[in-house]
Amino acid sequence: MRNFLITGISRGLGCEIAREILLNGDAVYGISRTLSDEAKELARDFPERLKLRLYDLSDTDGILKCVFKEFIGLKTPIHGYVNNAAIAYDDIATNMQMPRLENMYKVNVFAPMIMTKYAIRNFILHHVKGSIVHISSISVHTGYKGLSMYASTKGAMEAFSKNIAREWGGKGIRSNAVVAGFMETSMSASLTPEQKSKIFNRTSLKSPTSLKSVAGTVAFLLSESAESITGQNIFVDSGTI
């Protein structure tokens, strides 16, 4: 049985990724700022293999102590880390407010960089050829009004992921990004039907991206079947063009 660390596990994509991993017989250490009914139900279904910890990733100073020392434990090997947690700041650049921008960068960029640092240290300590998967966004590659600031955080993580793959490939450690299209999640709930229709009409499939498709891709990248895949951006976006 392998152990995987997932952030943003409470609902939506994070919960679906956790479910995929648990159904494969592995264990999940899940981090979330809140605990949803969806996550509670998952914990009831997998009481021995799903461990949950409430933690606000904007508190970057506490990650080592609260996540890696107290929650996982330094003696516990982890075999993969999924950076799924993110917050959105939807607005045009001329309306930028620094406190909101800084908080988004803390959660979307600085926290996963620090989490990656300690995940790699855990891999090396336990002689694990670990896999890191960052959830990115199609907004990095195809412009959307109001997403310039959010997209910049995901673009930063794509660059980080590719360079981590280069730095640590010699240890058998892999790093990839899954570029997800627009999904029906709480993050997109504020969009009007008209806005959603415009977005989905830009895709080849004329439909939202399936949570299951993204989660299944993440599970594959974490598996040994993907042992030769690293430094890549894998698009799961309903064919956005």
Language-model region placement:
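Active-site loop immediately N-terminal to the catalytic Tyr-X3-Lys motif
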Residues: 94, 142-148, 206, 224
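Alpha-helical segment proximal to the catalytic Tyr-Lys
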Residues: 121, 125, 162, 166-170, ...
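Active-site helix of classical SDR
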Residues: 116, 153, 161
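Conserved mid-core segment of classical short-chain dehydrogenase/reductases
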Residues: 87-102, 121, 146-149, 187-192
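Catalytic Tyr-X3-Lys loop
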Residues: 87, 94-114, 133, 157
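Residue(s) in the substrate-gating loop at a strand-loop-helix junction
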Residues: 137
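Conserved glycine-rich cofactor-binding loop
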Residues: 10-11
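C-terminal substrate-recognition "lid" of short-chain dehydrogenase/reductases
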Residues: 207-236
